């Protein structure tokens, strides 16, 4: 006995520590930061055949709640998890963990297990008033009791659960991103390396209770070891965290990357209205009831009138101004209406206080346009035809319900003061919509959208005083259609109009080239030198269409009509500026910049699952590089393609005057996502 006492006094023999029955162990303890510790110890699938297997899956999910003040285990959570990748356990796994195949077959998937675990945590938060902290903080108070997770090594939460959630694309709870590595804490506190959990318990004089490699038994023994270390004066602190921390390196790169992200977000949510100008507010204040039905399905393909409208007289001088105003087209793209409609460009004096009908038309046109347009002379939509129909429509002043059926027309006022042709502002070059709300002005339809499919070179225009040679083709209470074959407009000296082939591509915006004057000369409104009679305008009515029509994209369709055998194309008329060979269509796309300013890396999902084979971009910095930190950038390639597609389409729609056929324009409208609804709405004649 004396020898044992001497050996214990010299520290050669350690005596097993026994907690008194009162529950108050002896020894001085530091005040802990965390009032509760949740100890977890997962068991996963394993093999010993020497073959390469996939990552392990959790098959047992245990957790125990330890009170750091009393050392008692107040609550426990336990569930068996059904593996999905390898549902059959190996013999080695069954012998090591003691888990049988029947137990995992009756278990729940990891997703449901995490949901049950979160419910258990939520119940503890309500009963014990605990909360989780990402890192070290102030000690727990009587009101809020801090809690932290404890594991034996970083494998449980840092490797096993982390990568399984990534493979199965499960949302891991945020509070599982920080934990205390008890093995590392043990090594720092006792200054020695433990030989496993059972070896560490033996070194401090605690016998292992239960079965080794049983998840619940390992969690209980780990809690006993943590309590022993707390009694010995160890202060438990967070040792590992997966929460993203902003790096302090390269602040300029971070600022530049942040600005790039903001630009991309602005491009995806284009046409965001932040605050209209004073002139727009004045127009909007008079039409509160018309704002919900102001855009049609072709609101991005034809011109609208804003500001001063062109009168019907003095067309030759106006045509001269148009020819000289095309070089003045602006190509600067913008995404904000405030930037597009500059408040410094005041409207003419004649439009400072427009009438009610003018305000309705102006408000609808200004809403749908993306750049301010002060003059519109001709429709910017090229019909998908080769010949103009040789019929003429005569209408009275109250034929607005019928005219509302036609689209893509030019709106001219019945009477208005002639402007100064020397001070004509430049024409805007964007896709704008035609306003059909003014019921008090004369509407003149120009170049219908659906015309007869014949040779376009035999275009004929009928003078106003040729009604004696006409034969009535169609007559209604509002309009009369005559056959005017053989008549020819004396003032029309335009050459043959040739249209380019329409290639099947979702974006059909093209810029006007030097041949604009020849194109505009074809318009009967500009070629005629006299003012049209508003009661009988020589126009070609288009075939009536249904109010709601679903158009399908035809990849082999072109502008050429199905009845024609040949289609002549003049590349000098319209030149396409859209690159038909998009980089992402060919499989090559420049990787975007990640958050740390580096060029991201393109990877492909190789694991089994719903995203198998998908490509994504992530930070090129590896997670295990000590000198660098990964910024955590991640984006699917499909999402990036959609963002760049929208940005490409918006840039083309704002850089030049867009010409598009009716079929491709509908495809263009369907592919673009605008914040303003481009759904089918009631026509102006049906709103009242």
Curated annotation (Swiss-Prot):
It is an enzyme of class 3 (hydrolase). Mg(2+) 2 binds at residues 41, 156. Mg(2+) 1 binds at residues 41, 43, 218. It comes from the Eukaryota. One of its GO terms (molecular function) is zinc ion binding. Residues 337-367, 523-546 are annotated as: Disordered. Signal peptide: none annotated. A zinc finger (GRF-type) spans 594-640. Its EC number is 3.1.-.-. Zn(2+) binds at residues 594, 596, 619, 631. Binds 2 magnesium ions per subunit. The active site is at 43 (proton acceptor), 213 (proton acceptor). InterPro entries: 3-5_Exoribonuclease, ERI-1_3'hExo-like, Exonuclease_RNaseT/DNA_pol3, RNaseH-like_sf, RNaseH_sf, Znf_GRF. Its cofactor is Mg(2+). Residues 337-360 have a biased composition (Polar residues). Keywords: Exonuclease, Hydrolase, Magnesium, Metal-binding, Nuclease, Zinc, Zinc-finger. SUPFAM superfamilies: Ribonuclease H-like. Gene3D superfamilies: Ribonuclease H-like superfamily/Ribonuclease H. Residues 37-226 form the Exonuclease domain. AMP binds at residues 43, 213. Belongs to the ERI2 family. This is ERI1 exoribonuclease 2. It comes from Mus musculus. The lineage of its organism: Eukaryota, Metazoa, Chordata, Craniata, Vertebrata.
